[in-house]
Amino acid sequence: MHTLFSDQNSFTRHYAQTAAGYGSASAVAAASSASAAAAAHYAYDQYSRYPYSASAYGLGAPHQNKEIVKPPYSYIALIAMAIQNAADKKVTLNGIYQYIMERFPYYRDNKQGWQNSIRHNLSLNECFVKVARDDKKPGKGSYWTLDPDSYNMFDNGSFLRRRRRFKKKDVMREKEEAIKRQAMMNEKLAEMKPLKLMTNGILEAKHMAAHAAHFKKEPLMDLGCLSGKEVSHAAMLNSCHDSLAQMNHLAGGGVEHPGFTVDSLMNVYNPRIHHSAYPYHLNEDNLATVASSQMHHVHHAAAAHHAQQLQRHVAHVAHPLTPGGQGAGGQSSGHSPTTISTPHGPAHGGWYTPETPPSEPVPHNGQQGTPTHPGHNNNNSSSVLNHNGVGNGGGGGGGGGGGSSSVLTSSPTSALGFRDMIFEQNQSCQLDTGSPTGSLQSASPPASASVAAASAAAAAAVISSHHHHHHHHAALSGNLGQLGQLSNLSHYRPHVGHYQEYGIKYGV
């Protein structure tokens, strides 16, 4: 094999054999020099990155007579090494010297030069902190330690590279900046909390707007046809009506809609149909009539008991302006208050078209008020309308006794709210079929003759059994106004048609 690719040992042995041919002295000298070169260590083995020694490959022979190379570490790195390798992370100046000489043989010579540099770096660099000696251990000199903020001054923990010169003021400035950034973040978080509350408030407002159908309001009345005293009374009554409607919806919402039906879905959540339970016009006469009816309801609790035995319902007050139904032949003459007997069905029952008001004004000339289309009745029962106290029972019902005051009885469900007690109108109103555009039609079934007869009989029984209490109602009627004087309602028909046309046109 060629000597270039041969083993280093075989080449040495070959060199020794050839050299032995010239003389024994020269051969011994060559062998000793080769063994010395193989045994010599590479001067940079202690700083090498590789675990193996460079002398194994014969690299130590050319450098065997040169001095040891200086370590590639700065004096700051050497001092930091000594401090971090100490037991308590603090060491004296003499301890630093000992660590450096034990670790790096280069510093074993020329001690005066590098030890002076160590003291100089300890004094000038702020990363080294001098700690007074407080223990009773033997020795002299203070301890040296590293500043807590300077532990990361070396890049990735390597002592060969330092990021920058450590300065305490820079560290303090960085800390202040970090505190300021944290304070700014806290302020931003504090500003975001009111925004969150506002967002929740907007969501709640949207939720209330989505459920605004529960709180129905009356359509705005065009008060141009009213003047003076009537305008103020109408505005006040409409505002009171809105408040009562909202309170009763919250208090008795479950009672008004007892079960799930298609009619309940269409009636309750349709604004135009939902108004069937409220009167469209509220004035002094209507308020007086309602108050009179309430007083009659309180004074005649016994009459309510008799009516309950007949109809299995609780006595209730109906609106006194409802015209007679188709199933009963009503008569009206004289100037006495109205007598109505109406057995109500469930609350919010029946259909209603916006063209027809819940009630018709009673003519003052003593003639019977006849609806426009008597062939269509939105009532489930019939009513008897009299001015002189003489009742004619429809379909076999008996007549009632005479009197000068009104007797108003009806029999709805016992758990109705206060709003329905005052404003329930849709059970006894006549409806006009059709609309200006033909979009709405009345779809209620006609009244039953047997129900009309039963209601008339109940009214006659109550009137005949409680005629001795009529003087209370005469006084009340005198104080609140005559119910027969209803001529101020003549404006109602064209006025209702006017704003209902706009309601249908714009979907109000």
Curated annotation (Swiss-Prot):
GO function terms (MF aspect): DNA binding; DNA-binding transcription factor activity, RNA polymerase II-specific; RNA polymerase II cis-regulatory region sequence-specific DNA binding
Originating gene: croc
Protein name according to UniProt: Fork head domain-containing protein crocodile
InterPro entries from the UniProt entry: Fork_head_dom, FOX_domain-containing, TF_fork_head_CS_1, TF_fork_head_CS_2, WH-like_DNA-bd_sf, WH_DNA-bd_sf
A single cellular component GO annotation: nucleus
Ranges of compositional bias, category Low complexity: 375-389
Species of origin: Drosophila melanogaster (Fruit fly)
Signal peptide limits: none
Entry's Gene Ontology BP terms: anatomical structure morphogenesis; cell differentiation; regulation of transcription by RNA polymerase II; specification of segmental identity, head
A Pfam family assignment: Forkhead
PANTHER family: FORK HEAD DOMAIN-CONTAINING PROTEIN L1-RELATED (PTHR11829:SF388), FORKHEAD BOX PROTEIN (PTHR11829)
Gene3D superfamilies attached to this UniProt entry: Winged helix-like DNA-binding domain superfamily/Winged helix DNA-binding domain (1.10.10.10)
DNA-binding region, residue intervals: 69-160
Biased composition (Gly residues): 390-404
